[in-house]
Design a protein with these regions (language model features):
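C-terminal amphipathic alpha-helix
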Residues: 30-49, 93-125
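C-terminal motif of bacterial Sec signal peptides marking the signal peptidase cleavage site
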Residues: 19-22
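Bacterial N-terminal signal peptides that target proteins for export
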Residues: 2-13
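Alpha-helical segments in soluble extracytoplasmic regions
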Residues: 32, 36-86
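Asparagine-centered strand-capping/turn motif at beta-strand->loop junctions
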Residues: 151-155
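Extracellular/periplasmic metallocenter environments
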Residues: 122-125, 130-134, 142-144, 156-158, ...
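Bacterial signal peptide processing site
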Residues: 24-26
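Beta-strand signatures of extracellular beta-sandwich domains
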Residues: 160-164
Length: 255
């Protein structure tokens, strides 16, 4: 974890940053929809692992359920999102998936869903602002359950908010964790979600948090801008990760 960010982590960051946000609601229908979106993001974040077919099947199932549960106010936007993602998943092409995720149509539809979720779901939402190179936020007082993170990039570079949960038996601080070999470090954490935003953009991430120790981290390399997104995604862009410049913060979620 101490070196330049691997391509797989960039891929997850971009996907999380572009995939619609979720929430919990004031009616059964809204609540079901919001929780379905959380499940969808969790399926995406898990990645294909060793069995792409199983992952694709699970993600297809969650997206189909999401479309069925969508309230009338966002049915069109959700239909646009699933109409972009499902064919790309079926094709098995990462290029097709990213072309869809980066399309104007997807971005506009995701923004509609974001707005609906923020207004209707009724979960606690913490504001997180990214600057070069730190997070400006107060994450004290978070409690277990569904929570939102309204992520805004006020910096000049691209930033992400990677949400990390320390395993219950992990004793290292986030700084100490990054001194360990990458494989050992990753064995001590899980990653419930992430948001990604270009300068001036924002994204809202909703996750179901368990009690425990957490941190938010930016893994993107120094120098990451919208002008070199292809080099970033391919892993060609080299530079110290933003967390090495101070872009990381620990917090605790109460039970």
């Amino acid at each position: 974890m101490g070196g330049a960010k691997p391509r797989s982590w960039v891929v997850q960051a971009v996907v999380f940053g572009l995939v619609l946000a979720a929430c919990g609601g004031t009616s059964v229908e809204v609540s079901d929809f919001c929780e379905s979106v959380v499940e969808t993001e969790a399926a995406i974040s898990s990645g294909p692992g060793d069995d792409v077919a199983v992952w694709a099947g699970q993600l297809t199932e969650t997206l189909t359920e999401l479309e069925q549960l969508a309230p009338d106010e966002v049915a069109g936007a959700v239909g646009t999102i699933t109409g972009i993602l499902l064919p790309a998943i079926e094709s098995g092409s990462e290029e097709a998936l990213f072309a869809g995720l980066e399309s104007t149509e997807f971005g506009e539809a995701a923004a509609v869903v974001d707005g609906y979720m923020t207004d209707e779901c009724g979960w606690q939402v913490a504001d997180v602002t990214a600057v070069d190179y730190q997070f400006e936020t107060d994450l004290g007082g978070l409690e277990a359950g569904y929570n939102g993170f309204a992520f805004e990039n006020a910096g000049t570079e691209m930033h992400e908010m990677a949400l990390i949960r320390f395993n219950d038996d992990t004793t290292e601080t986030i700084e100490e964790l990054f001194e360990l070999p990458e494989e050992e470090a990753f064995s001590k954490i899980t990653m419930p979600g992430a948001s990604f935003a270009a300068p001036g953009d924002s994204d809202t991430l909703f996750v179901d948090l368990e009690p425990g120790r957490y941190a938010i981290v930016c893994f993107l390399p120094v120098g990451a801008t919208p002008d070199n997104i292809e080099a970033l995604e391919s892993g060609e862009l080299q530079g110290p990760p933003h967390f090495s410049q101070g872009m990381l913060e620990e917090f605790t979620v109460a039970g």
